[in-house]
């Protein structure tokens, strides 16, 4: 049974305009610790905008996003402190092309979490081992397949020890034969109790892993 103490993210009256176009029309949602919220909907429904508002990659026009008890949409809040607790995985991987896999992974922990290079490297190698990519640590992103890049992007986000992972259509840019390897990593994360918000078209994943499946249409949650 969940209680108010379990709520990690609470969204109240979330609105987002792009010019005169109202993309989000007052969304309310609760994400509890350990939840896997799967967000589905047609292209242009507002689902990716909703996800990107959760860590203020898109600045909401109105509403509250309460994360760990703090309204991060308040102008007095240091959003960067809270972003560190939110891992983000994009459709296009967003790895730094001029850095090896390992350097991509340890950059955040060393620069932002002030970990030693040795500690960050040890943790990064353990995570790469978990996703079967320890032998690619010294390769560059251009040497990896799309599925391998996305697995690296996921464990790179995990290196920051996030409280929640946000996935914006993580498999939609992949060749069909590579989708499974990425979903497998995400399923294991869910099994380990990671709180996740996933925008996806993968209905099998939604049914198997989602604790809460929400359908967004024209900027509102029409079903959950």
List where the protein language model places each region.
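ABC family nucleotide-binding domain
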Residues: 6-9, 15-224
């Amino acid at each position: 049974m969940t209680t108010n103490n379990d709520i990690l993210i609470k969204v109240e009256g979330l609105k987002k305009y792009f010019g005169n176009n109202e993309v989000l029309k007052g969304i309310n949602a609760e994400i509890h610790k350990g939840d896997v919220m799967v967000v589905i909907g047609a292209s242009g429904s507002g689902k990716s905008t909703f996800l990107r508002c959760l860590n203020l990659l898109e600045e909401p026009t109105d509403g509250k996003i309460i994360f760990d008890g703090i309204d991060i949409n308040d102008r007095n809040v240091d959003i960067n402190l809270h972003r560190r607790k939110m891992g983000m995985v994009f459709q296009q991987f967003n790895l730094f092309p001029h850095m090896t896999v390992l350097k991509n992974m340890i950059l955040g922990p060393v620069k932002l979490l002030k970990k030693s290079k040795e500690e960050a490297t040890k943790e990064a190698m353990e995570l790469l081992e978990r996703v079967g990519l320890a032998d690619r640590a010294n390769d560059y992103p251009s040497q990896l397949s799309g599925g391998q890049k996305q697995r690296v992007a996921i464990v790179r986000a995990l290196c920051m020890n996030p409280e929640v992972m946000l996935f914006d259509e993580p498999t939609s840019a992949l060749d069909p034969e590579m989708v499974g390897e990425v979903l497998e990593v995400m399923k294991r994360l869910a099994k380990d109790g990671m709180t996740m918000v996933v925008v996806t078209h993968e209905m099998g994943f939604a049914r198997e892993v989602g604790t809460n499946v929400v359908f967004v249409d024209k900027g509102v949650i029409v079903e959950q």
